Amino acid sequence: MKTLKLARRLISVLGVATLSLSAQAADLTFGYINGIDPIKRAIADGEYEKGIGQKIDWRAFDAGPAVLAAMASGDVQIGNLGSSPLAAAASRNMPLVAFIVSAQIRSSEALVVRDGSGIKTPEDLIGKTIAVPFVSTSHYSLLGALKHWNLDPRKVNIVNLTPAQITAAWSRGDIDGAFTWSPALGEIRKTGKILTDSAQVSNWGAPTFEVWVARKDFAEKNPKVVADFAKVSLAAIADYSAHKKDWTAASEPVKSIARLTGANAADIPELLDGSYFPSASEQKTAQYLAGGTASEIGKTAEFLKEQGKIEKVLPDYSGFVSDKFIGE
């Protein structure tokens, strides 16, 4: 119950936050989480500053809820987060718009159990301590896995830790397992085994994805900035898709991602392979920004409500998604 109360408190904070109107085009602050994707290479190499033509203050966050809090306060105008925190925020009518689906999460997020923990089957999770960043895509996937296994989440000691805290808690032996992403995932896999991952959970009916969102007031006043941001992002994805075999651990793109995120360069090619990155042409299709993304946000919200993480589900989430910034 304690973890459930913490999750509700976090969602409540996001829900009551209001967006100030202080953002100006000449003062850009963008936030990201340290998931592994081609866009991180563009951030590390300064391509957004070149493409947008302005100085950008980049801020790294531990997880999506922290990005949302910064956007709600007015500190950040454009941010990177997962489908679960987006669904929670949209259900509270936070004025945001998702304008890029940056990744369909597959094996890049996983539930790892510690060697020697005694966890060999899903049923062994009962009574064990499992860490996850609350209201994140990993949290959603963990709850989806427990539902698939017919396990009551209340019988598992689920604790709220950021990826960095997960790595530290793992090294101390404080937790038996964790559902997370890299760099933490790459570290804990060294002394643990994967029980399931987001690809498998997606097949069980709980898919997750990552997006870039803008504050609605900022997007309305600065559509070219948002469109230029999308252009740089999708060029980075296209470069990876066209030269995937060249993105080895010793390559410059992978070194750039490692420098930005702190992930081990040797792990990055496999982690990149653990997600699917929709192309510019795919973004505007019914599968993504032209309908599918809004539908998936709604399904995620329904699941979060079922799990007691949010209080209501909106009848329509299409107002939180737009494809108009693609190709402008």
Protein language model regions, located:
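Sec/Tat signal peptide C-region and signal peptidase I cleavage site
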Residues: 19-25
